[in-house]
Amino acid sequence: MENPNIKIVERYLDALRAKDLSRAPVDPDVQFEDPLTTPSSGIKAWTEFVSGMLPALNDVRAKQHIAEGATVATLWEADTVWGVIPIFEYFRIHEGLIKEAKAFFDPRPITNAK
């Protein structure tokens, strides 16, 4: 039986693909971080950060999910103007929303282009 939290992460990735963050199941008090930002929290900070990346995003492809309880670890690819970037992201789900997201990827394709 598939962990229902995988569907929540898939909805998140679908929102990125559609470039419609209003569809992302993200908690108002979300905590997030990745190699391009310091640990941050709150839907406003998350929306500002992710909105800045959306223009460079061409597609999103989920490759694999590993789920246990409230956590989902997802390997996905961001097809961007800088090339395809593999991302491994840890999600913690609470009451149907993403409460925490930590992405791990090599930022050099992005930082070297600036």
Features from the language model and the residues they span:
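Alpha-helix initiation/capping motif
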Residues: 1-2, 39
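Short beta-edge strand/loop motif at the mouth of beta-sheet-based domains
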Residues: 28, 38-48
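A beta-strand edge to alpha-helix "cap/lid" segment located at domain peripheries
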Residues: 7, 17, 33, 44-114
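Short N-terminal helix-initiation segments at or just after the protein's N-terminus
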Residues: 15, 34-39
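Short acidic-aromatic low-complexity motifs
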Residues: 2-28
